[in-house]
């Protein structure tokens, strides 16, 4: 699976949304109806999966699925 597929699968699992609803430009709050607890749990799962810590400041900037994918790509390089 690609990074994008991995991230989308985690989002589907964590937020309980349909895979068809998870697009690169989907906003966690507006499009996927996530609340702050959902986002905290999502960040924790991403940290565990990709084995690095996401600072609170960075987490606040991750507003869309694409933001998360780009952030992880940058951290992995």
Curated annotation (Swiss-Prot):
Processing after translation: 4'-phosphopantetheine is transferred from CoA to a specific serine of apo-ACP by AcpS. This modification is essential for activity because fatty acids are bound in thioester linkage to the sulfhydryl of the prosthetic group.
Domain Carrier: 1-76
A Pfam family that the UniProt record links to this protein: PP-binding
BP term (GO), one: lipid A biosynthetic process
Places the protein is found: Cytoplasm
Main subcellular location of this protein, as a coarse class: cytoplasm
GO MF: acyl binding; acyl carrier activity
Keyword annotations from UniProtKB, A to Z: Cytoplasm, Fatty acid biosynthesis, Fatty acid metabolism, Lipid biosynthesis, Lipid metabolism, Phosphopantetheine, Phosphoprotein
Family (UniProt): Belongs to the acyl carrier protein (ACP) family.
PANTHER family for this protein: ACYL CARRIER PROTEIN (PTHR20863), CARRIER DOMAIN-CONTAINING PROTEIN (PTHR20863:SF76)
HAMAP family: Acyl_carrier
Protein task: Carrier of the growing fatty acid chain in fatty acid biosynthesis.
Record-given protein name: Acyl carrier protein
Annotated organism of origin: Chlamydia trachomatis serovar D (strain ATCC VR-885 / DSM 19411 / UW-3/Cx)
Protein encoded by which gene: acpP
């Amino acid at each position: 699976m690609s990074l994008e597929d991995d991230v989308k699968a985690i989002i589907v699992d964590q937020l309980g949304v349909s895979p068809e609803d998870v697009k690169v430009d989907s906003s966690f709050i507006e499009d996927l109806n996530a609340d702050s607890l959902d986002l905290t749990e999502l960040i924790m799962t991403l940290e565990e999966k990709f084995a690095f810590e996401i600072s609170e400041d960075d987490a606040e900037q991750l507003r869309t699925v694409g933001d998360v994918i780009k952030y992880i790509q940058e951290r992995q390089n």
